[in-house]
Amino acid sequence: MTINKGTKHHDIKARIIGVHQDLFDITCSLGTGLARIKQGSYRDSAAMYPTIGDQVLVNWQGPDQSIINTTLPRQSYFKRLDGASCGHWAQAVAANFDEVFIMQALGADFNLRRLERYLTLAWESGGVPVVLLTKADLVSSAELATKLTAAQEIAIGVEVLAISNQSHQGYSALQAHLQPVRTIVLLGSSGVGKSTLVNQLQQKCWQPIMIVPVIRI
């Protein structure tokens, strides 16, 4: 059956896969395209303003003309306070993920207090945390062992992996997390290797992976 992409279809379930200020990349059963917010839809529900990963209901009007009506309930989400509201309401920055890869580099970025705070954020988000200690190829075996043990003592009950995006050390242990029906979000400081990991993993499998914008804690 051929779908007429120009025909209007109301209340179609779609997912946000990209955000460009007031434009959103969406994907649904009818295809992919751009969508805008229905005027006035989020005036009284700013916290539910669409973000990447959200499931939404749209009026499909073609690849680049669809209208977002409402955001469906989230199973998990990260949020940060919106500066324009003087801290009165929070803005979601990623939604509907299954696991949170908390990334810290095994060098100057390694910080147990920050790791503890990220773990709290991950559990509160509704996702399951996994700690990735990156750039394992840049430290000695002794330093790696010491920091791995320290992280495991902080992240009780959480899987902790040491990986290298250069040598692919630890990548085999990531395979259990790479399932097409699951979504992963990456959380960590700038420079720890988030974008590199995304590029490496998406060459090996098809799976939604999101990078959370900076959350200051």
Where are these regions (language model features)?
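Canonical P-loop GTPase G-domain recognition
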Residues: L138-V192
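Walker B catalytic acidic pair
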Residues: K135, G188, I211
